[in-house]
Amino acid sequence: MASVVEALIPGGKANPGPPLGPALGPLGVNIKDVIEKINEKTKDYNGMQVPVKVIVNDDKSVEIEVGTPPTSALILKELNIEKGSGESGTVVVGNLEIAQVAKIARMKKDDILSYSLKAAIKEVMGTCVPMGVTIENLDPRECQKAVDEGKFDESLTAEAW
């Protein structure tokens, strides 16, 4: 039966220390090779925490599955800031354009439950609320209503889902 190790690691910077090394050591795989493969697969997410699943089969072969970073991490990267607001609702730390929100929604396409770009955009907007991030200089909840009303339809027609 295969063993599975799941961890949240910095993109492109996995190392043999915790959390991966101690979990992989008892499984008898070459930790150095596994770390190199993980770093190769996660290099595009440099500076972000990335969920990684390492599946070690009985014959010691290894499969690596890389998820996408949390939506909040993608929002922070898009805004080039370190962290969200500690006082959401009163302190605004950044503003996203609707095209940036659509870009994040497309990046999360495989991980979210939405069937349409509009629904995915509304999910991303929902993550912006507690982070203190506005969209088109509006509260994200107002933007969600605007998406429902079709106010961004022209902007989103060029966006592929």
Swiss-Prot record:
Phosphoprotein listed as a keyword: no
Signal sequence region: none
Alphabetized SUPFAM superfamilies for the sequence: Ribosomal L11/L12e N-terminal domain (SSF54747), Ribosomal protein L11, C-terminal domain (SSF46906)
SMART domains, per database record: RL11 (SM00649)
GO cellular component terms listed in the entry, alphabetical order: large ribosomal subunit
Gene3D superfamilies: Ribosomal protein L11, C-terminal domain, Ribosomal protein L11/L12, N-terminal domain
Domain of life: Archaea
Function per UniProt: Forms part of the ribosomal stalk which helps the ribosome interact with GTP-bound translation factors.
UniProt subunit comment: Part of the ribosomal stalk of the 50S ribosomal subunit. Interacts with L10 and the large rRNA to form the base of the stalk. L10 forms an elongated spine to which L12 dimers bind in a sequential fashion forming a multimeric L10(L12)X complex.
Family: Belongs to the universal ribosomal protein uL11 family.
Official protein name in the record: Large ribosomal subunit protein uL11
Protein's organism: Methanococcoides burtonii (strain DSM 6242 / NBRC 107633 / OCM 468 / ACE-M)
